[in-house]
A protein has these predicted regions:
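Non-Sec secretion/translocation targeting segments of pathogen effectors
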Residues: 1-2, 19, 323
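Bacterial N-terminal signal peptides that target proteins for export
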Residues: 2-15
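Short non-domain terminal segments
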Residues: 11-12, 26, 31, 283, ...
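Low-complexity, intrinsically disordered/propeptide-like segments
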Residues: 12-18, 30-31, 44, 226
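Low-complexity, intrinsically disordered tandem-repeat tracts enriched in small/polar residues
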Residues: 12-26, 49-61
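Signal peptide processing junction and immediate N-terminal pro/mature segment
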Residues: 20-41
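Functional cores of ribonucleases/endoribonucleases
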Residues: 35-43, 47-90, 94, 98, ...
Length: 325
């Protein structure tokens, strides 16, 4: 028996469908959907997850051509040769520079230039209080010293001081730094000189040299140096300075070591260890002192000295030494 369709129900059903279609068109107009070809949809990839924003580095990165600083105000511990197993800051805050330090720097002049005996004589003559202090530290004279007596000591302590610091260019080597040949830096063991060279954009810390670096925090800093000289970079992998020694203290300690190391070495270089005591550091530290009968050759702090080396106040047979920094 055929199913009968009630006319009223048919009309109601048709009206319901029409209403639903109209409502759908209103909620989702045709422009809502982008018309994208099927082929393009198949070639699309999912959007990658956003990468995390990297944290800013605390280590200042020099721009190309810039020199790395010797000193800064940021504590950046690094793993270096010494101390082993402990990261330390190789670039401490800038050292204090006093009036006499500035006079010494002025005497040094441009990096790599020579310092004459007359310049050092003038420096001492201008600073009699410094000379008196050094004189008092060594008992008022540099004699009797074996070997020194043959040089006919000068009538004044000041002139003797000039001689021991100039005859082997010790003043220039230690306090100013030298350029040897075309690619080597000699000496350079005065913290204020490092600061001056940094501020003038002349020299900086040698990068990627951690295996050669040694630090006794707050006291001794041994590091590589690169410097701009005559339009090119000159470098040395191992230089160093005492952070707590100003120019007057270097001259005083060096003169003390010269007199205490009472040995007749003639023209041969003799080496000893000198203990530096300073109230800014908890423990004394050693400095390597080198001289011959003519004068002071070099004087620099060492974080890892040869403990078997003779002390400056002890007599010992002369033995060959390695080239000085």
């Amino acid at each position: 028996m055929p199913i009968r369709t009630h006319p009223t129900l048919t009309i109601a059903f048709f009206m319901a469908v029409t209403t639903t279609v109209a409502a759908t068109a209103t909620l989702f107009p045709e422009s809502t959907f982008a018309r994208v070809p099927i082929a393009e949809l198949k070639g699309r990839k999912k959007n990658p997850a956003p990468k995390p924003t990297p944290k800013p580095s605390t280590t200042p990165t020099p721009k190309p051509g810039e020199l790395q600083p010797f000193f800064d105000t940021i504590d950046i511990p690094e793993a270096i040769s010494f101390p082993r197993g402990k990261a330390v800051d190789v670039t401490p805050k800038p050292p204090e520079v006093n009036a006499f330090d500035k006079e010494v720097l002025a005497t040094c002049g441009e990096f790599g230039s020579s310092v004459s005996t007359s310049q050092i004589r003038a420096l001492f003559a201008k600073n009699p209080a410094i000379v008196t202090q050094i004189s008092n530290a060594v008992g008022g004279n540099l004699t009797p010293l074996r070997g020194f007596a043959t040089q006919k000591p000068s009538p004044t302590f000041q002139e003797d001081l000039v001689q021991i610091w100039t005859t082997r260019s010790g003043f220039e080597h230690i306090l100013c730094g030298q350029i040897k040949g075309t690619n080597k830096i000699g000496g350079l063991h005065f913290a204020a000189r490092y600061l001056e060279l940094q501020q003038k954009g002349i020299a900086g810390r040698l990068p990627n040299n951690q295996r050669q670096e040694e630090v006794n925090p707050g006291a001794v800093y041994t590091l590589g140096v690169q410097a701009k000289v005559n339009g090119k970079l000159v470098s040395d992998r191992k230089k160093g300075y005492s952070y707590v020694s100003n120019a007057q203290e270097i001259l005083t300690d060096g003169t003390r070591a010269y007199k205490a190391f009472n040995i007749n070495s003639g023209e041969n270089n003799s080496v000893c260890l000198y203990s530096i005591k300073d109230n800014q550091v908890a423990q004394p530290f050693d400095a390597v002192f080198v001289k011959n009968d003519r004068g002071i050759i070099t004087f620099y702090p060492d974080a890892t000295p040869d403990r078997g080396e003779r002390r400056c106040d002890q007599d010992a047979p002369i033995r060959p030494m390695t080239p000085t920094p």
